[in-house]
């Protein structure tokens, strides 16, 4: 996506054995990142406490961001991460790699930091309870991982993702869309026509 500074990567798995092969890991991408003052930013939350930004440095060992809630994962952990390469992330300056897994199901993002000069980033389907029986000559295609690079901080990476969504990744992204009115969060059990009309006017 040259108009958005986004690349997508994925993995295609096939085999020519006589019997099905059981797949147990589904990495869409692997990215080595040179060690330094590297930080990550990601979203975590829960009911009524969604999308809280967590920012932390990468240290030796393993860091895993994952979800096993299936299609209900949008209010807990998100399958996106910003990787700041030159210190604590800033909004408008600094080198940032943005990564977003294009997948609404169970996911796993993992950083392995060993005793060498790299952090190793893996992204894909969460392998917990996700085994897949791959038939001979069948092709299993993992979800895409969208990646961008910015030297304008978190904001620059975020704007690239917005352009990518508007310029074609999201179907009819520039068309007006209906809005779902969440009456439960707004009024709980006190639902009536007058209240609903007022909520719509407040949008």
Residue ranges and their predicted role:
Residues 115-135:
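Short acidic, Pro/Gly- and aromatic-enriched capping/linker segments at domain boundaries
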Residues 99-107, 146-171:
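Acidic/glycine-rich phosphate/pyrophosphate-binding loops and surrounding catalytic core
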Residues 26-28, 104, 147, 181-186:
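Active-site beta-loop-alpha junctions enriched in small/polar residues
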Residues 11, 137, 181:
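Conserved, mostly hydrophobic/aromatic
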Residues 132-151:
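Short Pro-Gly-centered flexible turn/kink motifs
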Residues 160-203:
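An acidic-aromatic substrate-binding cleft motif
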Residues 112-116, 186-187:
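Primarily single-stranded nucleic-acid-binding OB-fold modules
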Residues 1-112, 128-130:
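Polysaccharide-binding surfaces and accessory modules of carbohydrate-active proteins
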């Amino acid at each position: 996506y040259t108009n958005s500074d986004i690349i997508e990567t994925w993995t295609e798995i096939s085999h020519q054995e006589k019997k099905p092969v059981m797949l147990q890991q589904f990495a869409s991408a692997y990215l080595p990142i040179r060690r330094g003052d590297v930080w990550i930013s990601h979203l975590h939350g829960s009911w009524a406490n969604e999308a809280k930004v967590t920012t932390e440095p990468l240290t030796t060992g393993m860091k895993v961001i994952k979800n096993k809630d299936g299609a209900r994962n949008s209010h807990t952990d998100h399958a996106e991460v910003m990787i700041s390469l030159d210190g604590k992330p800033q909004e408008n300056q600094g080198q940032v790699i943005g990564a977003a897994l294009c997948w609404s199901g169970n996911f796993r993002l993992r950083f392995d930091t060993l005793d060498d000069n790299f952090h190793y980033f893996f992204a894909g389907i969460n392998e917990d309870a996700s085994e897949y029986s791959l038939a001979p000559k069948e092709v299993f295609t993992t979800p895409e991982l969208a990646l961008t690079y910015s030297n304008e901080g978190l904001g620059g990476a975020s704007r690239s993702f917005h352009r990518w969504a508007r310029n074609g990744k999201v179907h009819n992204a520039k068309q007006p869309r209906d809005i779902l009115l969440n009456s439960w969060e707004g009024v709980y059990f006190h639902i009536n026509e007058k209240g609903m009309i007022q909520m719509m006017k407040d949008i």
